[in-house]
Amino acid sequence: MAREQFQTLTEPMYYILLALMEECCGVDIMEKVKVISHGRVVVGPGTLYAMLAKFEENGVIRLTASEGRRKSYIITEVGKEMLKQEYERLKTMVLDGSGRV
C-alpha cells in the first residue's frame, strides 16, 4: 500500500527517509536533511510533520519514543524497500541521460 501511495518520492520525502535510517526526532531530522543534501534541501516543520504523519500512517516509518512533545521515529522495512526502489529509479534516470546532456 505504501508504494502505491508514494509512486515517486519528492526530494524532501527522499531525504527525510534517508535521515530516518537512524532513529531521530523532528529537529534532528531537519538538521540531518540539511547535512545529507549539503544544504540543498531544507525541510520546514510544517512539511516535516505532515510527511511524518503520512509515512507513519502507511507503515513507512514507526514511532520509537514519545516524551512530551518530542517524538522519535525510524524507518521500517517497508520504508527501506521504498527508499531502495526510489534510489534505483533515480539511478536509472541518471544512466538514461548519461552522454545525452
Task: Enumerate the predicted regions with their spans.
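Beta-hairpin "wing" of winged helix-turn-helix
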Residues: 56-68, 74
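Basic, amphipathic "hinge/linker" alpha-helix immediately C-terminal to the N-terminal HTH DNA-binding motif
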Residues: 68-86
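Basic amphipathic alpha-helical segments that dock to polyanions
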Residues: 48-55
